Amino acid sequence: MQMADIAKQREQPPRAMSTTSGSDVLKSTTTGTTTGTTKSSVHTSDTNYGVGSLRSDCSEEGFGSNLTPEEANWLNMARVFTKAEKPFKEQKTFRVARKLRTWRPRRSVTWSFLRRLYNGREDMKEDLIRDLADLEIEDKPV
């Protein structure tokens, strides 16, 4: 009989949406002359953080059937803000015109390419020798 009274008087832990912290390490219940503290822990090495609220939320009586005022307000505001939103983005209607690849002579053909093509590669040696001569540093007398 005493265990049933203790279970009835046990206070509900705070829910996830409330503003209070969810750490319920020790819960003390007072029935007449006996005071009992029940640890909400699974193992001795457990940190006792949130185990009691996890057990009570998964039980039959508090399975989310009753909402706290904060949760009800949050749901109401979510409905208000998401009422005007469209569920999917409208598809843009555009046509893709496929371009034919045309050969542009001005892009790929240079004068040096044409000279190599018609005169052979021997003609380019003179330009190379001239460029190398321009790059050489001449010693100036001091």
From Swiss-Prot:
Residues 17-28, 39-50 have a biased composition (Polar residues). Residues 1-66 are annotated as: Disordered. It comes from the Eukaryota. Keywords: Developmental protein, Differentiation, Spermatogenesis. GO terms for biological process: spermatid development. Residues 29-38 have a biased composition (Low complexity). This is Spermatogenesis-defective protein spe-17. The gene is spe-17.
